[in-house]
Amino acid sequence: MTRASRTSWKTLPPPQQREALGFAAAFNDAETELLVLGLVPKEMEDKWFIYFEGPAYRQQASPGPASGQGWLLFHRSWTGACIYGVHLERSPGGARVVDSWVSRDPAQYKGTDVEYDRKLLRFLIDALLLRLPAVFPMPAGVESAPAGVYQHTVVGRAYPESPPDAPFMPAQSRAK
């Protein structure tokens, strides 16, 4: 599988207006490899372009996962707007998130709820990058929309949905 890079898709630079996301996660070696591969859209329904950027994360000559640290960047595929940034750092057995942010540029992203942004980012990682079964987190205020409509604008695919007030349960890691 080919690794996504900044030049794999048309993108805008990361926004100047950002909010700290406080996203916390750790990933095993196999999951880290999937994160580093990223995601290049193949169809119109693919709403995200995701790539890892960090020269210290080059593949090692010996077998095993990459080493170092860098940023996993999440862009909307149609506009190129960069919505999320996740700084990964190598840890024993995988990688962990050491910093994260969400765009607060109102011309590029209308979201303002940091708690929902953490849930959505976790969903994007689980469903799109790790290919785990995942439930799409519905935000407050879209309850009157027909089932699947809001989700389609965000991810373009059909996933089970959770109500806005439901506790968010990330997909189970394959790591033990």
Regions found by a protein language model. Give the residues of each.
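Short, surface-exposed beta-strand/loop "edge" segments at domain boundaries and coil↔beta transitions
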Residues: 59, 80-85, 106-112
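Negatively charged, low-complexity tracts enriched in Asp/Glu with abundant Ser/Thr
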Residues: 1-67, 149-176
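Generic structural hydrophobic/aromatic packing signal, biased to beta-strands
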Residues: 1, 50, 86, 100-102, ...
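Canonical SH2 domain fold
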Residues: 70-92, 98-102
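Generic structural motif
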Residues: 4, 55, 77-79, 91-93, ...
